[in-house]
């Protein structure tokens, strides 16, 4: 599984100051990507909330700091302010994870085409459960699943070539042959969501009852989102939710 933050909303501090909202002078982390270290999403959420009451001057000392203000917003459940900023990830995960993730309709997807791209070149993602086993069991099952994948690749290529030999365009041949591909097939995708959407995804998938691979993905998304919007995700635990 791979997840990489590739884009995030940036604010125009000068424009906000002209309106009357003074932007906090955050110090960027020395350990993180400098392009995504200024917490613009947190600032934008606060600005949006304060605009509702024209409270840019921060009259309440208890919510004068961004962290405290957003904590109050979260407590009240007024999460629409988190919709103004977005984050985009490049993700490589199994087709199974794609199916789960696409159920979150508030996310936007661009996914590799199995009609135009040969999926056998993209690799596979083995279930996380295998890597919790004793090494002997793990190695045996990894070998079995990789062998099955190789066999399916051969069957896939045979079907594609057979159909192409009968005159079908390659994309139509791949369209038919993809029926034999397993759920562990790698499915590179670009996924964008606003921070309210990402909060919903993580709160649903960062849970011990969730599918193991998507839970692992949710944890990685949370880690990276906290680098750009720590106060937006301040209420989400470092370990998966439990019953």
Curated annotation (Swiss-Prot):
Keyword flag Transferase: yes
Record keywords: FAD, Flavoprotein, Methyltransferase, NADP, Nucleotide biosynthesis, Transferase
Cofactor note: Binds 4 FAD per tetramer. Each FAD binding site is formed by three monomers.
Binding site for FAD: 80, 103-105, 194-196
Entry annotation: catalytic residues: 205 (involved in ionization of n3 of dump, leading to its activation)
Record domain ThyX: where: 21-239
Reaction(s) catalysed by this chain's protein: dUMP + (6R)-5,10-methylene-5,6,7,8-tetrahydrofolate + NADPH + H(+) = dTMP + (6S)-5,6,7,8-tetrahydrofolate + NADP(+)
Signal peptide (UniProt feature, chain positions): none
One GO molecular-function entry: flavin adenine dinucleotide binding
Cofactor(s) required for function per UniProt: FAD
Residue positions binding dUMP: 100-103, 113-115, 178, 205
Pathway stated in the Swiss-Prot or TrEMBL entry: Pyrimidine metabolism; dTTP biosynthesis
Enzyme class: transferase
Pfam families per record: Thy1
CDD domains in UniProt: ThyX
Superkingdom of source: Viruses
Motif ThyX motif, chain ranges: 103-113
InterPro entries documented for this protein: Thymidylate_synthase_ThyX, Thymidylate_synthase_ThyX_sf
Biological-process GO terms, alphabetical: dTMP biosynthetic process; dTTP biosynthetic process; methylation
Known EC number: 2.1.1.148
Subunit comment: Homotetramer.
Family label: Belongs to the thymidylate synthase ThyX family.
Function: Catalyzes the reductive methylation of 2'-deoxyuridine-5'-monophosphate (dUMP) to 2'-deoxythymidine-5'-monophosphate (dTMP) while utilizing 5,10-methylenetetrahydrofolate (mTHF) as the methyl donor, and NADPH and FADH(2) as the reductant.
Protein name listed in UniProt: Probable flavin-dependent thymidylate synthase
Source organism of the structure: Mycobacterium phage L5
Organism lineage string: Viruses, Duplodnaviria, Heunggongvirae, Uroviricota, Caudoviricetes
């Amino acid at each position: 599984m791979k997840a990489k933050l590739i884009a995030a909303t940036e604010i125009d501090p000068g424009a906000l100051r002209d309106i009357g909202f003074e932007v906090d002078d955050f110090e960027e982390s020395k350990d993180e990507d400098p392009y995504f270290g200024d917490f613009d999403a947190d600032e934008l959420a606060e600005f949006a909330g304060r605009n509702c009451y024209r409270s840019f001057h921060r009259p309440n000392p208890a919510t004068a700091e961004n962290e405290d203000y957003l904590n109050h917003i979260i407590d009240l459940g007024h999460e629409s302010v988190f919709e103004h900023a977005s984050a985009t990830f490049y993700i490589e995960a199994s087709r199974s994870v794609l199916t789960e993730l696409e159920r979150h309709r508030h996310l936007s997807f661009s996914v590799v085409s199995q009609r135009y791209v040969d999926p056998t070149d993209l690799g596979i993602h083995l279930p996380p459960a295998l890597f919790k086993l004793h090494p002997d069991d793990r190695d045996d099952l990894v070998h079995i699943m990789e062998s099955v994948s190789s066999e399916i690749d051969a069957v896939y290529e045979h079907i594609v070539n057979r159909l192409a030999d009968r005159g079908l365009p390659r994309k139509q041949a791949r369209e038919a042959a993809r029926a034999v591909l397993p759920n562990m097939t790698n499915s590179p995708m670009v996924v964008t969501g606003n921070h309210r959407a990402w909060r919903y995804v993580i709160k649903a998938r960062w849970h011990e009852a969730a599918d193991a691979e998507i839970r692992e993905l949710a944890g990685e998304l949370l880690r990276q989102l906290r680098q750009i919007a720590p106060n937006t995700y301040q209420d989400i635990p470092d370990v998966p939710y439990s019953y």
